[in-house]
Design a protein with these regions (language model features):
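Oxyanion-binding and handling regions
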Residues: 1-24, 37, 92-201
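N-terminal phosphate-binding loop and adjacent alpha-helix
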Residues: 32-49
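Short, conserved micro-motifs enriched in small and acidic residues
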Residues: 34-35, 70-74, 164
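Phosphate/pyrophosphate-binding loops at sites that engage ATP/ADP/AMP, CoA/4′-phosphopantetheine
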Residues: 44-60
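Short glycine/serine- and small hydrophobic-enriched flexible loop segments
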Residues: 45-46, 81, 171-175
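DPxDG-like acidic metal-binding loop motif
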Residues: 60-96
C-alpha cells in the first residue's frame, strides 16, 4: 500500500510518534515520562524536519483512541484532530487494546490494560480472536491464566509485558486502511470506557 501515515500513541505514560511510508518505518520518537502535552508537537515537528517529507504529503493520521489514560487520550486526539483539520487529512482511529494485541502469537489468553488502582480493562482471546466484550476487574480474576499487557512498572509477575507504540498503531492502520479511515473528524471520539458502563450491563 503506497501510503504515508503519521501514527500517534498517547493512551498511557508513553508518548510515541512515528512516520511510515509504504508500510516502512521512517522515523520514531518515544518518551515514557508522561510529558505528552510538551512532547507531542515537538516529536511531530522533528519527524518531518528529519525525514524531509512535507507534512501535507501524508495520507492519514492514525491515532490510538482508548481505552486508556483520560488525559493522554484528550491530548493525543485533540492534537490529531487539529492537525488533520489544518492539513485536510483523514484520521484512522485505532482501539488501544487492538494495538497491544498486534504481534501476539498465542491463541488463548487475556489482554489487559491498567485502568486505576487495582483495576484493569480486560479482553479475552480464544483461537487468536476477541472473545466476548471488554470487562473490568482486578488482575486476580485471571491470575492463573495466560496474560499479556502493559505493566507500566507495576509489580505484577503474571503479566507478559507489551509496550504500547505508535508502530503498532500504524501496522493496524495499514491492515485496515479502507475499513477504519474516517474523513469526518467530528465523528471521532475518545473511547472513555468507565467502570459504570460495565456495571450497567
Amino acid at each position: 500500500m503506497n501510503k504515508i501515515i503519521l501514527s500517534i500513541e498517547t493512551t498511557t505514560n508513553i508518548c510515541s510518534v512515528s512516520l511510515f511510508q509504504n508500510k516502512k518505518l521512517i522515523y520514531l520518537f518515544e518518551d515514557n515520562n508522561r510529558k505528552h502535552s510538551s512532547l507531542l508537537g515537538l516529536f511531530v515537528e522533528k519527524i518531518f524536519i528529519n525525514s524531509e517529507i512535507p507534512i501535507q504529503s501524508i495520507d492519514a493520521i492514525a491515532i490510538s483512541i482508548g481505552p486508556g489514560s483520560y488525559t493522554g487520550l484528550r491530548i493525543g486526539l485533540s492534537f490529531a484532530k487539529g492537525l488533520a483539520f489544518s492539513i485536510n487529512k483523514p484520521i484512522i482511529p485505532i482501539n488501544t487494546l487492538e494495538s497491544l494485541n498486534e504481534g501476539i502469537k498465542d491463541l488463548n489468553y487475556f489482554l489487559v490494560l491498567h485502568a486505576f488502582k487495582d483495576n484493569f480493562f480486560i479482553q479475552e482471546y480464544k483461537n487468536g480472536k476477541e472473545y466476548g466484550d471488554i470487562f473490568f476487574n482486578t488482575i486476580e480474576s485471571i491470575i492463573n491464566k495466560k496474560v499479556y499487557g502493559y505493566k507500566n512498572n507495576l509489580l505484577i509477575n503474571c503479566i507478559n509485558n507489551i509496550n504500547p507504540s505508535s508502530k503498532k498503531i500504524a501496522r493496524i492502520a495499514y491492515k485496515n486502511y479502507d475499513n477504519y479511515i474516517e474523513n469526518d473528524i467530528k465523528l471521532i471520539k475518545p473511547n472513555y470506557i468507565k467502570p459504570i458502563e460495565f456495571n450497567k450491563k
